[in-house]
Amino acid sequence: MAAAAGDGTVKPLQSAMKLANGAIELDTGNRPREAYTEYLRSIHYISQVLLEEVETTKEAGETVPPDTSKMLKLAQQCLERAQSTAAKLGKTRLKPTMPAAAPIPQPAGRHRRVYSDEGGKLSPFLPPEIFQKLQGAESQSCKKELTPLEEASLQNQKLKAAYEARMARLDPSQAMQKTSLTLSLQRQMMENLVIAKAREETLQRKMEERRLRLQEAANRRFCSQVALTPEEREQRALYAAILEYEQDHDWPKHWKAKLKRNPGDLSLVTSLVSHLLSLPDHPIAQLLRRLQCSVYSALYPAVSRAAAPAPGCCPPTPNPGSRRLRPSQSLHCMLSPPEPSAAPRPQDSPPTPPLQPGPVGSPSPLGDTASGLPDKDSSFEDLEQFLGTSERQGRGRGVQPEPQLQQLKTAVEEIHNAVDRLLSLTLLAFEGLNTAASKDRCLACIEEPFFSPLWPLLLALYRSVHRAREAALSRSMELYRNAPPTAIGIPTKLLPQNPEAKGATGYPYCAAAQELGLLVLESCPQKKLECIVRTLRIICVCAEDYCPTPEATPQAGPPPIAAAAIGADDLLPILSFVVLRSGLPQLVSECAALEEFIHEGYLIGEEGYCLTSLQSALSYVELLPRGGLAK
């Protein structure tokens, strides 16, 4: 009954996520104007809710609710997407050359759909030439200084206009004055051109002298060897271009002085790199755009050739009596709404209905299948055995085509090389960044703008490679969506002792599932990893709330996961339950991509522990038994 009571309560965060999901679906369906409206409506709703909460807490003298930070983050994401959609509306609108197919329910995605070159087939991504045009639009809008000859041409046009006006005012009888004006005009125009040509030659000579001088400085900075690779030659040319840029601008000198005065200030590093990449005429910012276009052009054909849709869109043959998984046309990863089931679920609720981890006599269709599950006390102790079985099954049932794997490896290598080039060039330009802490912060600041336009396409390729695993995970999510927490292996001591008091949250660890759902809104590996860390911290906080430990001592700041009250044997079943409730099979591909692109230094600390725990939970959920469910 308590679960039923919880069904009627819809949290504002859930409603806000539903609004954002609807806007993303419109954006995916090539309806940018409607999507822009829905993004603004989502922001307005979140602002209204937070304003009401502030007024309520002001009257009651309470603290800020815990969902406020999530609401603000969701509003920030909606605002960024609204800005992106508004920019697209102001640029070239692509017109379809063929009529669209019959409408099919589309999962949410990051980019609007346009027509690709492959026979009118729908593609969720912009063609490379359009992507390159959008990336270069900002740099083309930069102010360009006029050359001396161009300035002289403008001056001569003004002189000619003044001459024609004076000639129109003279009488036909004033022939001598007309001749004088004509000769004067010709003399002035010729003088302007001669002076401009001399200035241009002098300027070109000085520019060439400066270029040679800066090239020599760049050569001295690098090791002097006769045979240079193309990459080394380009690196020298870029460094010389940076030196030339610094000759014409003063701000790099000021920033270098700031770094010298405050060598350990990481906020200064963040501000510097953000400012640097925001200037479209800086050589490093220009290199970033060129590398983005190169990676995008390499990814686009590989993703376009992956014609088969991704899970929950490429279902395996279902067992008799079981339901087929919902097909989809998109390779995107954005908050795919689950298929309506025979058991009604409220539209405003999270991906699964609130459940009561209560008595054994639950009417859930999984109530009689607990015996078919692994023993909840020992299931996670044998996790290595399950993971080994998963690897063997993966090798046996669906080896990916070699070309697709090779395309992924090539793309990953190109991305690593691109990021390394950007980082090394930035460290060359600003020597004050060449410390361990500053280098890590600089890398994080470079990765965010670099990955933002590329991540949806990159993830689509990962999803096509991991389609079989995502299908298995999607099927487990479908079969176990109503499973009580105890059936997944969560001990009762780590569940709410007074479920009626927790009715508003819907189900145990609901906050962790909501936080994990925010991961797909990010487009930077570092921010995605931070979302995973927050998810596990929320799990630990919820577990301590459900089962407080008297010996726990307060400590400043958020405790590391390893120091939490629950151990790995308790954390993994809880995390598996959270994964089931997230309804996001694309987490398999997200984690595979994060493991590849996260810096090694993070993988040996708390972040690496959290990522490994999530991967273990995903592998376990994939292998949940199928027997006894098709009744």
Swiss-Prot record:
Residues 187-221 form a coiled coil. GO terms for cellular component: cytosol; endocytic vesicle. The modification Phosphoserine is found at S116. Ubiquitous. SUPFAM superfamilies: VPS9 domain. Residues 467-630 form the VPS9 domain. One of its GO terms (molecular function) is guanyl-nucleotide exchange factor activity. InterPro entries: VPS9 (IPR003123), Vps9-like (IPR045046), VPS9_dom_sf (IPR037191). One of its GO terms (biological process) is proton motive force-driven ATP synthesis. Residues 318-379 are annotated as: Disordered. The keyword Repressor does not apply. SMART domains: VPS9 (SM00167). Keywords: Coiled coil, GTPase activation, Phosphoprotein. It holds the Pfam family VPS9. Residues 337-362 have a biased composition (Pro residues). PANTHER family: RAB GDP/GTP EXCHANGE FACTOR (PTHR23101), VPS9 DOMAIN-CONTAINING PROTEIN 1 (PTHR23101:SF98). This is VPS9 domain-containing protein 1.
